[in-house]
């Protein structure tokens, strides 16, 4: 709902915040279309009619299908994904709506070899980070904000520290999800769906990591930010947007 941004967004959902003349979600949809994605499912919650009004169908974005999560006030992002699951018939890309990022993030995920992958970045220092913990497939040195691209198996995803594990990167909010993984996530959600249910999709991925191999892909120098509070918004304007439009 973007409560921490209410002084900026007013009644606008976060995904409709404008940067460089485009809303966050429209920019993402353009990126998707440029990568050959022809259909997108948009799950709405707060002020869902605003999305319908803003996202008029045109040739620059994929064909849109809107799904409204009626219990958005009492649920986290996993329930939004659960609501959309009946409309997903093939492996898909999962994108959070409050992201400002460079376009190479998408082909990095799309071209990853394997049905599932969670995109990670190097250290951003933006605050409110969600960390991906895991083990590297290959022995490599260097800190997580290096320019290297690294892949590995996820051991956990959390804001909380795991002293026994190593931080491999920060969760970006862009993933490639197979129907097989989606079904397992939804099965877990059914078991834990007493309302209010504020768990997010990445928590279910984290839960499943002990039972199945789910990889991360870290692009150490990826330019991006989520926009979840005032400091994120200011960082997006002053640091991220200028690097995207230079």
Where do the protein language model's features map onto the residues?
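Conserved core of the sugar-phosphate nucleotidyltransferase
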Residues: 102-194
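Phosphate- and divalent-cation-binding pockets in alpha/beta enzyme and binding domains
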Residues: 4, 50-53, 83, 104, ...
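N-terminal nucleotide-binding beta1-loop-alpha1 segment
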Residues: 1-10
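Conserved alpha/beta core of the MobA/IspD/sugar-nucleotide pyrophosphorylase nucleotidyltransferase superfamily
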Residues: 168-246
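Conserved N-terminal catalytic core of the sugar/cofactor nucleotidyltransferase
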Residues: 22-92, 193-195
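Conserved beta-strand segments of alpha/beta enzyme cores
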Residues: 15, 63-65, 153, 213-215
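Short catalytic helix/loop segments, enriched in acidic residues and glycine
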Residues: 11-27
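Conserved beta-loop-beta/alpha segment of the NTase-like Rossmann-fold superfamily
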Residues: 59-131
